[in-house]
Amino acid sequence: MSDARIVAVGVEEEFHILDLTTRQLVPRAEEVLRRLDGDSFSPELLKSVVETNSQPTADLLELRTNLLDLRRRLAEVTGELGLGPAAAGTVPIVDMDLLDVSRDDRYEQMTEDYQIVAREQLICGAQVHVDVADRDLAMAVVAWTAPWLPMLLALSASSPFWMGADSGYASMRTLVWQRWPTAGVAGSFRTAAEYDQLVADLIKSGVISDPGMVYFDVRPSAHLPTVELRICDACPDVDNVILIAGLFRALVCQAIEEIEAGGQAPPPRAELLRAATWRAARSGLEGDLVDILGAGPIPAQAMLRRLLTEVRPQLERFDDWELIDNLAEQAVGRGSSAHRQRRAFARRGLLTDVADLVLAETRDVPPAGAAAALGSAPAVSASDQIAPRLLERYQPTGYDEIVDARGAVRPQYRAVMRTLERLGPGILDERVGTREAEQNDRGIVFRASGDSASRPFPFDLVPRIIAADDWTTLTTGLSQRVRALEAFLHDIYGERAAVADGIVPAWVVNDAPSLRHGGRAVGPDAIRVTVAGIDLVRGGDGGWLVLEDNLRVPSGIAYAMEGRRLAESVLPELGPPAGILRLDGIPALLHEALVAAAPAAATGDPAVAVLTGGKTDAAYFEHSLLAEKMGVALVEPADLLVDDNDVVYRIDGSRRCRVDVLYRRMDEDDLFGALGAAGTPLGLPLLRAIRARRVGIANALGNGVGDDKVVYAYVPRMVTYYLGEQPVLDDVPTYVCGDPEQCEHVLDNLDQLVVKPVDGYGGSGVVIGPHAEPYRLTEVRERILANPRQWIGQELVSLSTHPTWHDSHLEPCAVDLRVFVYAGREPRVVPAALSRVAPPGSLIVNSSQGGGSKDTWIPRR
């Protein structure tokens, strides 16, 4: 194929004209057009739409510059009139009584002929034109490109709202457009003459009046040697237009090569193509598309990757591969415009927010140099090109999860950082304020150690991405770990075989601060670890290490859920892309695990209640949210009564409801000392009910011995001993001060190690040697010597850092990851995680010490 066969590509974009005060579609295109010079702007059927026409060019970056220039000119003129252009398939706020048809004989006749179809043409599209040698070749190209058109539609989907309501479709424009008698899938034509004859017959029939009214999804131009792509919605993001233009040109190139080689296009399956188009309009980029080859549904992202592979040779020939691959990654990372619009609406339920989002994305111009950056991959990944403002002074000292050692943004974060860069510091600061206000309104608060009042739980704006391969490894390793700890707890409160066999020293168990007599009350068949929270960190090499096991009352899952909701609400431009594990099903998974903790005596559907210490509890928000989401009671000790070993709670002071499972969200010592509904301590009656197998407690009493910091050092041995397996995950190297040799090593290296009291909770009592003052090291040395069995030492792990928005700039802050495992019949790793982030300059991420969290994206495999 000669390059002359594909001379250029051009784009026509249609823009709705909105009133910036009401965000309503207004019929003022004629007024706008009178202020615009040149042939690049023109009217459309309705007076509320302006069309722009780019110059044809062989260079996609030049095309991008041209489109941006046209958008700027249109935005400037409309802005002077209090108006704004909106590039989207539809807009949400429309008053049909205000709208009218453009003053043009052709348009007026179309309205007379087609009536409501013409009057409701409240849609805008983006059309791509690719030059070909002649119209016969153009007709042959149509058949070759047809199977990929639904994918291009999905990329463009930007019209979820229609006449003020969510249509349920990603591209409602497609359904409106297909009401025209000649819209949709093109037929099969061997030559341009056959096609022209069809057009002549349609005109003769009176159904259309001219060749320009043939609205096939792809067609030869009526007056130029080009192939026109007409299926796509208008796109707010100009880079989506460039992506579609580049892919379509590559498809045309590929088709011409096949035709010149004597190939025949696969016979079109019009019914399947129509079904595929409908599915793309329904689902957009976030759902499944139809595999035209007949293999069934396929995720849109997988279809996009297949298309990129298909046309890579053509993209490379035009030096477009790096650009298009980058833009495809960006499109997937941001999600479709339809998806972003729905998130904007979900935030406050206001259609004006949707309109504002589309207006902003249409007029926003990327920073200077962005065009060059987009076209210069692999240098495109350099941080000074991806996010020059936000990362200008960002200097991590160790392993950073977003910026690598060369200062380049890691590939999986490019789309995220581009979006944050486009928003800029001012908007990000505003969103922090919005976030805090929303948290206060919804009661998403936490009380840190030493605080007299609750405050908004710190949620950072920059999301964290866990690679799918990493998540697979973590899932396997954490399930293994919880199975071993479950076996250990049963053993320790039973025959203590691990002690007898020398796996765990007897003193480790006997001296454990959390060893409880009540732990023996739990039956041998009971599940002891219903909910585990395992903390992990990434070391200096980026590898994962288990830092701590939490088997008593691990908190955080509700904050992970609310973090996602807040992120989608406060930063709808960013939001998690399609293909990220959703969090909707977490309450159901938790309820399922809690039901499995019910005693055998429970009849029917076991009744579950969340047991909280009350509104003064630091994590009361989580307790109440989980109870609400699971549809179960939230009770305090004062609500509970143990009657003949049955546990009940009071409703309205008189009615009683049985409880089969108490999801314990308070320390067991506090629970045992708390007064029940009878006005007496609840501990002994509750213990009798547990022994009688009339109530299940999740997590079980006495579980604290399993997350003892000394016991942590022996978990790898437990995995081998109880399961006969090798540990999948590594631990932080740990020294037990109860062992004289190990204690000597700790004392000799206090200034290099992290030392922890075995009963420390939430980071309290931890001394980080390299950062500690000399007097603190002297203090801790004396405490270790006085009671060595109550201390451990660990190698200092250089925690990975993650960019965190703090005081109007990004800071590299230490992060860990809390992953939750729910144990019903088998341990199940919850498809969510809480990324906890330390304050700047600190290594302690615990919320009780002022730490916060980040939305965590886990891709589906």
Curated annotation (Swiss-Prot):
Record flagged with keyword Ligase: yes
Keyword ATP-binding: yes
Top EC category: ligase
Record region (Unknown): 373-861
Superkingdom of origin: Bacteria
InterPro entries in the record: ATP-dep_Glu-Cys_Ligase-2, CP_ATPgrasp_2, GCS2, Gln_synth/guanido_kin_cat_dom, YbdK
EC number: 6.3.2.2
Catalytic activity: L-cysteine + L-glutamate + ATP = gamma-L-glutamyl-L-cysteine + ADP + phosphate + H(+)
Keywords: ATP-binding, Ligase, Nucleotide-binding
GO biological process: modified amino acid biosynthetic process
Sequence similarity: In the N-terminal section; belongs to the glutamate--cysteine ligase type 2 family. YbdK subfamily.
Described function: ATP-dependent carboxylate-amine ligase which exhibits weak glutamate--cysteine ligase activity.
Protein name according to UniProt: Putative glutamate--cysteine ligase 2-2
Organism this protein belongs to: Frankia casuarinae (strain DSM 45818 / CECT 9043 / HFP020203 / CcI3)
